[in-house]
Amino acid sequence: MRRNSERPVRITEVCLRDGSHVMKHQFTEEQVRSVTRTLDEAGMHYIEVSHGDGLGGSTLQYGKSLVNEMKLIEAAVDECKQAKVAVLLIPGIGTIHELKQAANIGAKLVRVATHVTEADVSAQHIQFARELGMEVCGFLMMAHSASVEKLVEQAKLMESYGAEAVYVTDSAGALLPHEVRERIRALRQSLNIEIGFHGHNNLSVAVANTITAIEEGATRIDGSVRCLGAGAGNAQTEVLLAVLDRMGYKLDIDLYKMMDVAEEGVAPLLPVPQEIQKGSLVMGYAGVYSSFLLHAERAAQRFNVDARDILIELGKRKVVGGQEDMILDVAAELAKIKMEV
């Protein structure tokens, strides 16, 4: 529980959803069961399971899942004795049909995610989730790309629709600690609901940003074991827990067990070590959606251009989640320019 706070700090473990990007959406049912079981035994509060781009994301554009996400959600629910299973839903990708399916299977929390300036498209989904009896949070993605005033305006919309919390979502891993501080502080002063923070580690400040968010009043935070998440991953859960414990925050999650999950359960699944490589670093620097990395690397190979140039150009164009088709367009344009030089 947070020191001197009326509300506990709760963590959502996102390695089985955000980490799906790294796994190219190829999680097996047994992998989900094994990781969920050990996370639950460690005392994790929420475990998010779905396609990397949320419910309904298994498409040619976003990447086809190996196993139907509903089977993975059902497997996670089956393994949880105390943790709650969460799902992500992006309106326009997922629908209330998939949301109802997930709720019937046993998912208890949904985070309804929109671009930071498009909260108005979340109304139906937030309201429907409340009708289903689910916990529901708003998830304002690419939070670095809007002013603090715009962020507050959009968060208030989500609050008015019935969201029980609103997250500052640093999808690009572009925010610095002082920018997190001013955003969380502004929301804390403007809303009557909980505030959350979801970070990415592309600039190596995800843990620092999360600590800053908590200091400013955020009570819902995200982490990914062994940094298994898009780009350079999220705040590394086991590291975050160790830091919070040193600071006097008691979350009732077993730190040793979380270390074991990371080393024995998740590390063997990683296609490559999760570290800040040039692609993820450029995403944080340019402010590009973290799940674009693998798409950009594939496009770079196909068109014989530098993935960094693709990402920088995408940042200049201020592309948002859902515009993955722009990656190929940019790569083709760069290849044409290269041939003309």
From Swiss-Prot:
Alphabetized UniProt keyword annotations: Aromatic hydrocarbons catabolism, Lyase, Manganese, Metal-binding
GO biological process: catabolic process; L-leucine biosynthetic process
Keyword Lyase listed: yes
Active site: H21
Residues the entry annotates as binding Mn(2+): D18, H198, H200
GO molecular function annotations of the record: 2-isopropylmalate synthase activity; 4-hydroxy-2-oxovalerate aldolase activity; manganese ion binding
Site (Transition state stabilizer) location in chain: R17
EC number: 4.1.3.39
Record-annotated Pyruvate carboxyltransferase domain positions: 9-259
Cited CDD domains: DRE_TIM_HOA (cd07943)
Residue ranges of the TM segments: none
Reactions listed under catalytic activity: (S)-4-hydroxy-2-oxopentanoate = acetaldehyde + pyruvate
Sequence similarity: Belongs to the 4-hydroxy-2-oxovalerate aldolase family.
Protein's recorded name: 4-hydroxy-2-oxovalerate aldolase
Organism of this sequence: Bacillus cereus (strain ATCC 10987 / NRS 248)
